[in-house]
Design a protein with these regions (language model features):
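Conserved catalytic/switch belt of AAA+ P-loop NTPases
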Residues: 135, 163-175
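Structural recognition of the conserved hydrophobic beta-strand(s) that form the central parallel beta-sheet
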Residues: 146-150, 166, 177-183
Length: 369
């Protein structure tokens, strides 16, 4: 199965399998690496393996534990994700219906990215509820409690109270408990958290794996080749880009690129208004559209350096050539950094209209001056 990321990350899976066989399972691991490299899937599979009733080396997929883990419904599995701020400080009722829907979606598609609207941080209430559950005594004293924390850098958002609460768990973990933190942004974590975890560095997926995944998920050969070129080994990006026809995707890229280099104040107002609202309701779509601008800029920069843009057989190639002729001194590298800064500020929950305005102003400076 192409969805089995352990086949794409053989060296990492062998390392995790050896940990299971040794029975020297740590109390805390930190899975880090590039976006879309399969970290979440590997964390869940490792959790399934160390609770498998029939094997220490490979997941059997047949025992009751494996079946429950595959459905993400095992009583010893605790999945922590960013959630919207609740109306009260109590840990009761903090999970919106989108959380449960997302868990089901994740069980059906390992590359599904959980992104609940208005969920900007990991709540202190989630960590408090977790502590209560981890100290619960099971009648059947087998298996291991597993905590998997996705987007764990958001433990440290705001005043970092959730990160500090988790730190106490890491310092004095309950018996037979393993906490797996998963992040694309290791540098945003407290050093005290990092130092208490065994680091598992996940490399990027191969282009061959992403290509085969796209083919298995109904992309044509030409579409898969094009998407592999622009998704940069990010399986989440490949998944998102493959949801729409390539022609529509190309038109969207051109429209966004034209807007951010435009001097039309009305286009600016519409852009800032639309994407500020989108940021508040759907972080994944917000990042997706920023990525489309970055894709355009990377193509322009490659042409500038005499390389293939990846858009040779599309209508974007002539427009990119025209862009380079019109703006021969444009600093494309700095433009890309401007867009990446917006994504970084988005993770810090800063005021988005001002962030987007500053981005547009900076892009003008690096393109026109």
């Amino acid at each position: 199965m192409i969805n089995d990321v352990s086949r794409a990350q053989i060296a990492i899976w062998d390392k995790l399998s050896n940990i299971s066989v040794s029975k020297k399972i740590g109390s805390a691991y930190l899975f880090t690496g590039p976006i879309g490299s399969g970290k979440e899937t590997l964390a869940l599979k490792f959790s399934q393996l160390i609770n498998c009733e029939n094997s220490l080396k490979e997941i059997c997929y047949e025992c009751s534990s494996c079946i429950k883990f595959r459905a993400l419904q095992h009583e010893r599995l605790n999945i922590v994700v960013p959630l919207p701020t609740p109306k009260s400080a109590s840990s009761d009722g903090i999970f919106p219906k989108e959380y449960f829907e997302s868990i089901i979606a994740k069980s059906e598609d390992p590359f599904y990215k959980i992104a609940i609207p208005k969920a900007n941080r990991i709540l202190i209430q989630s960590i408090r509820a977790l502590k209560k559950k981890l100290y619960f005594k099971y009648e059947k004293d087998s298996g291991r409690n597993i905590v998997v924390i996705f987007d764990c850098e958001l433990l440290c958002s705001g005043q970092g109270e959730s990160g500090n609460a988790l730190l106490k768990l890491l310092e004095e973990p309950p018996d037979r408990t393993t906490i797996i933190l998963v992040t694309d942004h290791k540098k945003m974590l407290f050093e005290t958290i990092i130092s208490r975890c065994q680091n598992i560095e996940i490399p990027t997926l191969s282009n061959e794996y992403v290509y085969n995944w796209l083919i298995e998920n109904n992309s044509s050969n030409s579409e898969a080749e094009f998407l592999v070129m622009i998704c940069r080994a990010n399986i989440h990006r490949a998944r998102t880009l493959s949801r729409q026809p390539v022609e529509k995707l190309i038109n969207q890229i051109e429209k966004l690129a034209t807007t951010v280099v435009s001097k039309d104040s009305e286009k600016w107002r519409n852009f800032i208004s639309h994407y500020s609202r989108l940021f508040g309701t759907n972080h994944l779509d917000f990042n997706h559209h920023l990525n489309l601008i970055t894709i355009w800029m990377h193509g322009v920069n490659k042409l500038k350096q005499g390389l293939n843009s990846g858009f040779e057989n599309t209508g974007l190639q002539p427009r990119m050539i025209s862009f380079n002729k019109k703006f021969p001194k444009a600093n494309i590298f700095e433009v890309i950094l401007c867009i990446e800064d917006v994504k970084k500020h988005a993770r810090q929950n800063l005021y988005m209209p001002l962030i987007l305005l500053n981005m547009l102003i900076d892009i003008q400076k690096f393109v026109y001056e």
